[in-house]
């Protein structure tokens, strides 16, 4: 299973597996991310789920940084509260740089998940299989209504930042809009799981250049054009699966009218 990885990643994963197999507190080691989705290459991160014996869970959680430090030359690490997952430790190992995610759970916590993990080792295969069988993996694709209820609010934010002259803020929102709205909708159009803007270039799922049309420089006119093209791209993609909450499309008209007014300002 690990022999499909690039040499550097494989070496780290094999050492991690041996290290955890020798630690009786560890029940199982699972892998996810690109290991599951495919396309693993030299630029990929390693994503692991470390399943801990409940008797030692609090102990290991309290010492996660030190625990990670035993796995290699740990340069820096921080926990995943910013993505709503405090059990996650995001690590950078060196001297050859490698990003490794370690999620610490007990077997009972292995419930809701977005993917079926690869099992690198387990001390109780039957117990692990029973737990995995209780819940099916569910990829968190967003609904048409989810996009519609947010799209015009976020585009309005970009417009008012343009109006104030906060071009960096507007540029940041355009990037956010591509990642949260346009990218996922392009994946939807291609009948693929929604994954932000991940590997869109390699997948070739934006043949019309909808995303690149929304790129702008730090210039008021350029940002104004990019916001309008972002709105146009959204309407284009929205047509694939019309949401129930369009109503009379008043939000779209109001946002574009404000954009017209601010685009001619200054």
Please give the residue ranges for each predicted region.
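Metal-dependent nucleotidyltransferase catalytic core
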Residues: 1-24, 35-37, 50-102
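Hydrophobic C-terminal alpha-helix "anchor/cap" residues
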Residues: 19-21, 29, 177
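Acidic, glycine- and histidine-enriched catalytic cores of nucleic acid- and nucleotide-handling enzymes
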Residues: 91-128
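A short, charged helix-loop
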Residues: 116-146
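Conserved nucleotidyltransferase catalytic core and NTase-mimicking acidic/glycine-rich helix/loop elements
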Residues: 136-266
């Amino acid at each position: 299973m690990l022999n499909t990885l690039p040499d550097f990643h494989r070496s780290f994963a094999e050492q991690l597996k041996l290290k955890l197999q020798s630690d009786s507190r560890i029940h199982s080691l699972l892998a996810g991310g690109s290991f599951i989705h495919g396309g693993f290459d030299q630029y990929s991160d390693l994503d692991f789920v470390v399943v801990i014996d409940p008797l030692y869970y609090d102990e290991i959680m309290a010492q996660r940084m030190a625990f990670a430090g035993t796995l290699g030359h740990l340069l820096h690490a921080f926990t995943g509260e910013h993505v709503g997952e405090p059990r996650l430790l995001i690590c950078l190992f060196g001297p050859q740089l490698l990003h490794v995610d370690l999620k610490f759970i007990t077997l009972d916590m292995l419930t809701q998940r977005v993917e079926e993990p690869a099992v690198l080792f387990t001390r109780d295969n039957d117990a692990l299989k029973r737990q995995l069988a209780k819940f099916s993996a569910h990829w968190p694709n967003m609904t048409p209504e989810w996009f519609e209820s947010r799209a015009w609010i976020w585009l309005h934010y970009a417009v008012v930042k343009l109006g104030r002259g906060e071009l960096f803020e507007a540029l940041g929102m355009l990037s956010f809009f591509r990642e949260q709205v346009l990218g996922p909708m392009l994946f939807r159009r291609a009948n693929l799981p929604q994954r932000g803007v991940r590997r869109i270039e390699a997948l070739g799922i934006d043949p019309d250049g909808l995303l690149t049309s929304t790129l702008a420089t730090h210039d008021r006119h350029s940002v104004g054009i990019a916001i309008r093209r972002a709105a146009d791209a959204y309407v284009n993609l929205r047509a694939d699966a019309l949401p129930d909450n369009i109503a009379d499309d008043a939000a779209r008209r109001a946002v574009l009218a404000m954009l017209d007014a601010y685009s001619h300002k200054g």
